[in-house]
A protein has these predicted regions:
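Glycan-recognition and catalytic cores of secretory/periplasmic carbohydrate-active enzymes
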Residues: 1-184
Length: 184
C-alpha cells in the first residue's frame, strides 16, 4: 500500500513550480529507501528529484529559488523553509556520486546563514535576491506575526536544516548555527 501511494508522487518530477520537491520526495522516497533498501526503484527517482531541485539554483546568488510566482515585486524569492530541502541534495549526491549536488546544498546553507538571520538568531521568512549579482533586494516575513518577529515554524526549518548540514558535512559552523537558532 505504501508503495502505491509513494509512486503517485513520481509526476512531481515534471513540476518546475517550487522547491517543495525536496520535502515531498525526501519524506517519501527517502524513507522508502531507509525502510526497504530498494535502491533499484528508489534511487533513480530520488536522484532525478535532486537534479530538479538543483535546477532552481542560481550560482550568482548562491541559493535555490523557492517559488516561481512573483508578487510584491519579487524577482528571486528564497524562504527559510528551503533549508528542509537540502537533504534531498546531500543524499542525492551520495547516491549518485555527483558532488555538485552537495556543493549546491552547502552554498545555499552558507548563503542563507549569512543573509537570513538577525543578530538574535531569528530568521526572516523570505529574502528576495537579485539572481544576476546575488545581492539581497529585501527581507520580509510573509507568514508569521510581523516582519521583525520570530516565526516558530521557520526557526524549526532552520534548526533542522543546519543540524542536518552538520551531520552531512561535519562543518562546525552549521552546528553552531543550529545551536544558536535553538537557543534564540
Amino acid at each position: 500500500m505504501a508503495w502505491k501511494y509513494t509512486r503517485r508522487l513520481e509526476p512531481l518530477l515534471d513540476c518546475v513550480c517550487d522547491h517543495d520537491i525536496g520535502f515531498q520526495i525526501n519524506c517519501s522516497y527517502g524513507n522508502a529507501l531507509r525502510l526497504t533498501g530498494d535502491s533499484t526503484t528508489v534511487v533513480p527517482v530520488y536522484v532525478a528529484a535532486a537534479h530538479k531541485l538543483a535546477d532552481r539554483f542560481s550560482p550568482q546568488a548562491g541559493v535555490i529559488k523557492s517559488w516561481n510566482f512573483l508578487r510584491n515585486d519579487w524577482v528571486y524569492p528564497v524562504i527559510i523553509d528551503n533549508m528542509m530541502n537540502l537533504e534531498l541534495l546531500t543524499v542525492g549526491a551520495r547516491l549518485s556520486g555527483e558532488s555538485a549536488l552537495a556543493d549546491i546544498a552547502g552554498s545555499h546553507a552558507s548563503t542563507t546563514l549569512a543573509n537570513h538571520f538577525r543578530d538574535d538568531w531569528t530568521s526572516w521568512h523570505l529574502l528576495d535576491y537579485d539572481p544576476e549579482n546575488g545581492s539581497v533586494r529585501y527581507r520580509e516575513t510573509v507568514q508569521g506575526y510581523a516582519h521583525g518577529s520570530a516565526w516558530s515554524r521557520g526557526q524549526a526549518w532552520a534548526l533542522y536544516g543546519y543540524t542536518m548540514m552538520f551531520r552531512e558535512t561535519g562543518k562546525e559552523g552549521y552546528l553552531e548555527a543550529a545551536m544558536n537558532i535553538g537557543d534564540m
